[in-house]
Design a protein with these regions (language model features):
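Conserved beta-strand termini and adjacent loop/short-helix elements that scaffold enzyme active sites
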Residues: 68, 103-107, 142
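The start of beta-strands in P-loop NTPase/AAA+ ATPase cores
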Residues: 8-10, 120-121
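Alpha-helical substrate-recognition element adjacent to the catalytic core
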Residues: 3, 9-93, 98
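Metal-dependent phosphoesterase core characteristic of DEDDh/y 3'-5' exonuclease domains
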Residues: 92-94, 109-112, 127
Length: 159
């Protein structure tokens, strides 16, 4: 970890941004029953081979890659741990390399996870309220933007 704040940081949400959690059959009833399988079973929303390659290029150019993902709403401590484990397993299954993983309480301010390390951070998140509350830099709405193309633009700009 760097002593000074990183000037190049990308922060990823997972559910509805990287993973198609909401496309898993009975996802909500399973989460309410404290079943972590929807987090493991969700399909990727992007071509993961290409996304991983682009993120490797970003990391080589000095970008730090963070995962900041909410845990399931109203869950026990044991289930929170199971959800963190399931989300990390999903990332490993799809070969996504990251620098830091933050599985945080549902509704938590995501910027708090990186504020002490981020001078300027880009948030990729499907939740409009989360994006509106992000004050560490720009945001990307993955429901309206091709994230891979946007990340390639960052590389081409040499930022």
């Amino acid at each position: 970890m760097k002593d000074e704040k990183n000037t190049k940081m990308i922060c990823w949400d997972m559910d509805g941004t990287m993973t198609s959690l909401y496309g898993v059959d009975n996802w909500l009833s399973k989460l309410r029953a404290e079943d972590p399988s929807p987090y493991e079973d969700a399909a990727p929303m992007w071509d993961m081979e290409l996304l991983n390659y682009v993120c490797e290029l970003l990391r080589a150019a000095g970008w730090e890659i963070n995962i900041i993902t909410w845990l399931s709403k109203n869950s026990s401590e044991e289930y929170k741990d199971a959800v963190r484990e399931a989300k990390r397993a999903w990332l490993e299954k799809w070969g996504f390399i990251y620098d830091h993983f933050h599985g945080v309480q549902y509704g938590a301010t995501k910027a708090d996870s990186v504020r002490d390390r981020a001078k300027n951070a880009i948030l990729i998140d499907d939740n409009e309220k989360v994006r509106a509350g992000w004050h560490l830099g720009e945001t990307i709405d993955p429901t309206q933007t091709n994230v891979i193309e946007e990340l390639l633009r960052l590389l081409m700009k040499g930022e």
